[in-house]
């Protein structure tokens, strides 16, 4: 559940009510292990395109524009999958600031890095078509945040359980990379195995 950061700006008074409690079973974001597989729920990038469309910084057809704007204003939260995480996740975080930035937070202060495979990162059919038609840079589009999907790592032996959880909940769960040993070794690869860079690492908090 989100605590703060849920309202960027508004011309109306807004109140948020939250409740807090204690749990003996918590999945921390900094417990990833070397050789863990990296997974993410849902699709990435739609919300960012919605934001770009609202500021007229993206060339999108009107009917597609409505789709992306809707994803920005009303993200589909994968709440049903969260109750299964304890069965397989070693670490977990929500993708709010951007895939690469949030993944970096998961391995912060650990002697770990990540390998990401661009072609494995899930996007919607509409975004996929837009990337092909306009020759857009996929890794930059999916790195800007506001996706609110679940990013987690798990032992390779948990693959079958994860697949079952995806089928049970109806929520797409995709393996997108791997945790590797050693600091400062994080890499992103395209479909040909060539190393690529992301211009945008995500949203940077200024406080």
Positions of the model-derived regions?
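Helix-biased detector of long, well-ordered alpha-helical tracts
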Residues: 1-207
């Amino acid at each position: 559940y989100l605590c703060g950061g849920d309202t960027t700006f508004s011309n109306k008074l807004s109140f948020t009510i939250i409740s807090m409690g204690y749990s003996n079973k918590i999945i921390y974001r900094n417990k990833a292990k070397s050789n863990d597989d990296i997974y993410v729920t849902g699709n990435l990038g739609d919300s960012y395109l919605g934001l770009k469309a609202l500021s007229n910084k993206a060339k999108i057809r009107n009917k597609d524009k409505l789709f992306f704007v809707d994803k920005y204003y009303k993200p589909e939260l994968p709440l049903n999958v969260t109750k299964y995480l304890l069965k397989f996740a070693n670490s977990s975080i929500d993708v709010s600031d951007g895939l690469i930035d949030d993944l970096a937070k998961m391995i912060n202060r650990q002697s770990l890095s990540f390998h990401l495979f661009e072609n494995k990162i899930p996007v919607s059919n509409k975004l996929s078509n837009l990337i092909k038609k306009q020759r857009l840079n996929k890794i930059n589009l999916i790195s800007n945040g506001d996706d609110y999907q679940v990013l987690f790592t798990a032992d390779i032996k948990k693959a079958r359980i994860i697949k079952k959880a995806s089928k049970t909940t109806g929520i797409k769960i995709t393996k997108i990379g791997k945790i590797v040993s050693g600091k400062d070794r994080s890499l992103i690869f395209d479909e040909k195995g060539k190393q690529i860079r992301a211009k945008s690492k995500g949203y940077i908090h200024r406080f």
